[in-house]
Amino acid sequence: MSLDLVHFPNYKKTFFGSSFQSDTLALLTRIRDEIGCRYVTHTYRGRVGDCTKVNSADLTVLITLPATWVARYSSKNYFAIDPVFQEDAPYYRNDTSAIARDLKEDADICPAVAELLHDAEKHGLGNLFIAVSARNPKGVAGCTVFTFEVEDEDRTQFLARMRPRLLSLAGIIHGTVCGCKDANSVASLLTPREVDCLRWAANGKTDGEIAEILSIARWTVVTYLQNAKIKLNCSNRTSAVATALSLGIIDMPEVQHLV
């Protein structure tokens, strides 16, 4: 097993490869600014730039956390209890997809995880940690953790409101880090109408609303999205939208429709 660690402390440049660094750091900064998260961590089982090995023993971790917290995390050996890195974590399983989970669920059943999250909050990382699954067209799985400071809104309502957006963004980050960007071959499989339906779905529109916008029947929209899902090798609509976004087949939607 090998570990590739890519660290942008507080969204600052590092000594990592300049091409990867510029594109990825710009993406992470844009995501932070758009959704108001504090920090982003992404991990997937594979090497940087390798999007082909399913269930690899290798691990890539991309973080924007402060260097002081990374040092503390290491000294406390939090890796051993972090729910995102456990062997049975649901985010990497082949039979699951489109997961957006408040890590408080893990803290409620494990005192060690509760201690980890409390320590992270005490050190300014936020009070809400949401783990989001991602999967590329080749089946390589990953997980993004977004941290937020939520005061006035119920956690459950916040997660429900942000879930579609976070799933899309996790897919974009995943595709960027593991280098699965061969959009031309995938895009050529999709019809213009399938792309249109994916684009409107990414903007939060229902099947009925998409049908009205495109002046077609609702069942036709369902068929287009089903075909797109199959062509993108995705198990559900949300995953198909996230994959299309990560490959640049459709543009990242504005966040206003979720507010």
From Swiss-Prot:
Q: Which GO terms describe its biological process?
A: quorum sensing; regulation of DNA-templated transcription
UniProt xrefs under SMART domains: HTH_LUXR (SM00421)
Question: What Pfam families does the annotation carry?
Answer: Autoind_bind, GerE
Q: Which InterPro entries match?
A: Sig_transdc_resp-reg_C-effctor (IPR016032), TF_LuxR_autoind-bd_dom (IPR005143), TF_LuxR_autoind-bd_dom_sf (IPR036693), Tscrpt_reg_LuxR_C (IPR000792), WH-like_DNA-bd_sf (IPR036388)
| GO molecular function annotations of the record | DNA binding
Q: What's its job? A: Transcriptional regulator involved in the global control of Brucella gene expression. Mediates the effects of the quorum sensing autoinducer C12-HSL (N-dodecanoyl-homoserine lactone) on a large and diverse number of genes.
Q: What is this protein called?
A: HTH-type quorum sensing-dependent transcriptional regulator VjbR
